[in-house]
């Protein structure tokens, strides 16, 4: 059962996003207890392709990418909140790295 949804809004920062995702998949919480929802906010770079490659390399993790057309991070955060499947939602930015245990 998914207990925690981690939402990451992003806009044209594919390289930073991948680094953030690398830190997310190192979490020590069991994989079936969390999901990560990345919200692409009008990205025009290779965010979608790089996310798809990352997700394919980590099939054991619940990673999803959704698109949000509303301009700005508040639209992206709200979209992520609507997409979240868990009762508890955490947010990080696409340039952040989380330590092990962050999702505990």
Where are these regions (language model features)?
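Acidic helix N-cap motif at the loop->helix transition within catalytic regions
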Residues: 15-18, 45-53, 101
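Short alpha-helix within the catalytic core of nucleotide-sugar-dependent glycosyltransferases
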Residues: 21-22, 48, 86, 100-104
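N-proximal low-complexity "stem/linker" segments adjacent to membrane-targeting elements
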Residues: 1-26
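A conserved acidic beta->alpha catalytic loop
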Residues: 23, 40-49, 96
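Short aromatic/hydrophobic "clamp" motif used to bind/position activated sugar donors
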Residues: 89
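Short beta-strand/loop segment that forms part of the nucleotide-sugar
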Residues: 33-42, 64-68
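Glycine-rich, basic loop-to-helix element that forms the pyrophosphate-binding segment
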Residues: 68-84
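Hydrophobic/aromatic residue at the end of a short beta strand that borders the catalytic acidic motif
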Residues: 92, 97-102
């Amino acid at each position: 059962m998914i207990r925690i949804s981690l939402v990451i809004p992003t806009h044209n920062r594919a390289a930073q996003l991948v680094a953030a995702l690398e830190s997310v998949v190192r979490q020590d919480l069991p994989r079936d207890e969390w999901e990560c929802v990345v919200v692409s906010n009008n990205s025009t770079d290779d965010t979608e392709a790089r996310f798809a490659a990352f997700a394919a390399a980590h099939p054991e993790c619940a990673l999803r990418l959704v698109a949000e057309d509303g301009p700005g991070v508040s639209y992206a955060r709200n979209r992520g909140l609507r997409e979240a499947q868990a009762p508890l939602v955490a947010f990080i930015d696409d340039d952040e790295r989380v330590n092990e245990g962050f999702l505990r």
